[in-house]
């Protein structure tokens, strides 16, 4: 079963395309008193060309935890989405460090080297702050939710919470077969889906989510809004509580 899903993911990655140029920079954005300030540091030579935005408390205040944000539009030509994509989430969860990676073109979320680059960036951040990052939470919107699933399969860190918004998991394979993978059977899963999603109709997306939750063998739930739209702005404005309650426990 595991071999089947790994091969299926590999074929999905091939369909999305491949390759990975080299880079060695990671962008850090600090909060007040250095609002909008930024500086660069090495993300490691293994990384694809992935600009990464990081929002964290200035000074010595301890972060409550680290959240990785996976943006949507993972095959677009904009290869710097991560530099801004995590900003609104950071405002919503100011006590957390938010790491916002960038995917584009052939370096999308279903490409193993892109997931390796996320861990490489986290390694670099941990080195800079002189504190290991052993456990993280993951949040994805649209096809960024596929990044939540693939990091759960391929990433090297323990995962506490996952939120997947406006997703279509069927593109990774049948729900029961995806859910059967051992790395997915820990931590918490929350799916947030809308009945007015312009890209992923609920009659197709919701049954996959329900079957996944039934088979994954760990805490998993679905929050559904019949009027819910596809974009992050809708969930941010209408159902902020569905996101915040995951991080209040």
Question: What is the meaning of each model-derived region?
Answer:
Residues 63-73:
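Short beta-strand element of the alpha/beta-hydrolase
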Residues 109-130:
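Alpha/beta-hydrolase active-site loop
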Residues 17-65, 143, 208-209, 220, ...:
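A domain-start/cap signature at the N-terminus of enzymes
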Residues 96-116:
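Cap/lid segment of the alpha/beta-hydrolase catalytic domain
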Residues 79-98:
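Short amphipathic alpha-helix adjacent to the substrate-entry channel of hydrolases
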Residues 128, 134-183:
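Primarily recognizes the serine-hydrolase "nucleophile elbow" in alpha/beta-hydrolase
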Residues 190-192, 198-249:
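C-terminal catalytic histidine-bearing segment of alpha/beta-hydrolase fold enzymes
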């Amino acid at each position: 079963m595991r071999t089947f899903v790994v091969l299926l993911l590999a074929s999905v990655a091939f369909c999305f395309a491949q390759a990975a140029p080299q880079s060695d920079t990671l962008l850090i954005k600090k909060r007040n008193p250095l609002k909008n300030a930024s500086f660069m540091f090495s993300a490691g030579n293994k990384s694809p060309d992935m600009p990464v935005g990081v929002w964290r408390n200035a000074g010595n205040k301890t972060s409550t935890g680290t959240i990785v944000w996976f943006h949507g539009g993972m095959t677009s030509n904009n290869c710097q989405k991560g530099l801004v994509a995590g900003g609104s989430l950071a405002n919503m969860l100011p006590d957390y460090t938010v790491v916002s990676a960038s995917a584009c073109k052939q370096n999308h979320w279903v490409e193993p080297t892109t997931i390796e680059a996320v861990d490489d960036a986290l390694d670099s951040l941990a080195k800079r702050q002189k504190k290991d990052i052993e456990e993280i939470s993951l949040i994805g919107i649209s096809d960024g939710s596929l990044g939540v699933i693939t990091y759960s399969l391929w990433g090297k860190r323990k995962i506490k919470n996952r939120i997947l918004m406006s997703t279509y998991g069927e593109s990774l394979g049948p729900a029961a077969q995806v859910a059967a993978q051992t790395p997915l059977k820990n931590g918490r899963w929350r799916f947030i889906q809308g009945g007015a999603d312009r890209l992923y109709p609920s009659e197709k997306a919701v049954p996959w989510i329900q079957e996944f939750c039934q088979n994954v063998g760990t805490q998993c739930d679905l929050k559904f809004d019949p009027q819910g739209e596809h974009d992050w702005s809708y969930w941010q404005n209408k159902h902020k509580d569905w996101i915040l309650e995951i991080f209040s426990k």
